[in-house]
């Protein structure tokens, strides 16, 4: 039996995608729309406080295309806290007009494919920064779930640890070419959602998503073993722009 990779696990993550029922939203009197927006912004203020205390992070993006209209990405120390946030959002007036489109539950993950020393990795500042990240405030976001293939000779889970480590090392070298252009957060979801990992990319240049993903397709680990779900791409929604976004 092949050796399982050990993981370092950080904050839990929820990608909550919604579509907006614009037709119903337009029927609300203006005062009620403004009250709903104010209530939502008060909720986000709570998220901002949590982020300032480095007890979690969040991002809000509007999604381009018809798969969804808006994304709430939330990071918290526990699954219970994610559930509380999701429930609190669902109880707002605005949520009456936010229809579920897609969701993904996972946990920020680093694997042990790259060898490390004897030091406790959870005490290394750079490791902690990656496990408990404050999400970038970039202009664009790209999210997609993925699996490792388990078919015939292309069965990732039948490879030895050494083979997997070498393939991931080469894959990581491709990613490092985009340092400073794209920030990547990998979240593990085996046993938590339908795919095995979620990949979230942040950049101020959306074209870098295409370039990075395309170049990585030529890495053996992706060409032989990568299987992908739907891609979601969006633009950042600053809180000062929420009122204008929902204005009708």
From Swiss-Prot:
<keyword id="KW-0479">Metal-binding</keyword>
<dbReference type="InterPro" id="IPR011008">
    <property type="entry name" value="Dimeric_a/b-barrel"/>
</dbReference>
<dbReference type="GO" id="GO:0006785">
    <property type="term" value="P:heme B biosynthetic process"/>
</dbReference>
<keyword id="KW-0560">Oxidoreductase</keyword>
<feature type="binding site" description="axial binding residue">
    <location>
        <position position="171"/>
    </location>
    <ligand>
        <name>Fe-coproporphyrin III</name>
    </ligand>
</feature>
<protein>
    <recommendedName>
        <fullName>Coproheme decarboxylase</fullName>
        <ecNumber>1.3.98.5</ecNumber>
    </recommendedName>
</protein>
<feature type="binding site">
    <location>
        <position position="222"/>
    </location>
    <ligand>
        <name>Fe-coproporphyrin III</name>
    </ligand>
</feature>
<keyword id="KW-0350">Heme biosynthesis</keyword>
<comment type="pathway">
    <text>Porphyrin-containing compound metabolism; protoheme biosynthesis.</text>
</comment>
<dbReference type="InterPro" id="IPR010644">
    <property type="entry name" value="ChdC/CLD"/>
</dbReference>
<keyword id="KW-0349">Heme</keyword>
<feature type="binding site">
    <location>
        <position position="148"/>
    </location>
    <ligand>
        <name>Fe-coproporphyrin III</name>
    </ligand>
</feature>
<comment type="subunit">
    <text>Homopentamer.</text>
</comment>
<dbReference type="GO" id="GO:0020037">
    <property type="term" value="F:heme binding"/>
</dbReference>
<feature type="binding site">
    <location>
        <position position="144"/>
    </location>
    <ligand>
        <name>Fe-coproporphyrin III</name>
    </ligand>
</feature>
<dbReference type="Pfam" id="PF06778">
    <property type="entry name" value="Chlor_dismutase"/>
</dbReference>
<keyword id="KW-0408">Iron</keyword>
<feature type="binding site">
    <location>
        <position position="184"/>
    </location>
    <ligand>
        <name>Fe-coproporphyrin III</name>
    </ligand>
</feature>
<dbReference type="GO" id="GO:0046872">
    <property type="term" value="F:metal ion binding"/>
</dbReference>
<dbReference type="GO" id="GO:0016634">
    <property type="term" value="F:oxidoreductase activity, acting on the CH-CH group of donors, oxygen as acceptor"/>
</dbReference>
<dbReference type="InterPro" id="IPR031332">
    <property type="entry name" value="CHDC"/>
</dbReference>
<comment type="similarity">
    <text>Belongs to the ChdC family. Type 1 subfamily.</text>
</comment>
<dbReference type="GO" id="GO:0004601">
    <property type="term" value="F:peroxidase activity"/>
</dbReference>
<feature type="binding site">
    <location>
        <position position="130"/>
    </location>
    <ligand>
        <name>Fe-coproporphyrin III</name>
    </ligand>
</feature>
<feature type="active site">
    <location>
        <position position="144"/>
    </location>
</feature>
<comment type="function">
    <text>Involved in coproporphyrin-dependent heme b biosynthesis. Catalyzes the decarboxylation of Fe-coproporphyrin III (coproheme) to heme b (protoheme IX), the last step of the pathway. The reaction occurs in a stepwise manner with a three-propionate harderoheme intermediate.</text>
</comment>
<feature type="binding site">
    <location>
        <begin position="144"/>
        <end position="148"/>
    </location>
    <ligand>
        <name>Fe-coproporphyrin III</name>
    </ligand>
</feature>
């Amino acid at each position: 039996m092949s050796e399982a990779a050990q993981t370092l696990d950080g904050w839990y993550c929820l990608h909550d995608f919604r579509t907006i029922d614009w037709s119903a939203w337009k029927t609300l009197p203006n005062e009620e729309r403004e009250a709903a927006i104010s209530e939502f912004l008060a909720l986000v203020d709570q998220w901002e406080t949590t982020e300032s205390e480095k007890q979690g992070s969040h991002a809000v993006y509007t999604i381009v295309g018809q798969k969804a209209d808006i994304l709430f990405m939330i990071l918290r120390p526990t699954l219970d806290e994610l559930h509380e946030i999701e429930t609190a959002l669902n109880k707002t007036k605005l949520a009456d007009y936010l229809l579920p489109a897609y969701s993904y539950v996972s946990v920020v993950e680093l694997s042990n494919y790259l060898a490390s020393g004897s030091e406790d990795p959870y005490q290394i500042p750079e490791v902690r920064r990656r496990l408990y990240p404050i999400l970038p405030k970039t202009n664009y976001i790209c999210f997609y779930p993925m699996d490792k293939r388990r078919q015939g000779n292309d069965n990732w889970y039948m490879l030895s640890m050494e083979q997997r480590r070498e393939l991931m090392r080469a894959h990581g070298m491709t990613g490092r070419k985009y340092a400073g252009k794209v920030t990547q957060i990998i979240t593990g979801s085996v046993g938590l959602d339908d795919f095995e990992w979620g990949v979230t990319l942040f950049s101020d240049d959306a074209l870098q998503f295409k370039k990075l993903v395309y170049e990585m397709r030529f890495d053996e680990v992706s060409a032989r073993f990568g299987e992908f779900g739907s891609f979601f791409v969006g633009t950042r929604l600053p809180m000062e722009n929420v009122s204008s976004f929902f204005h009708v």
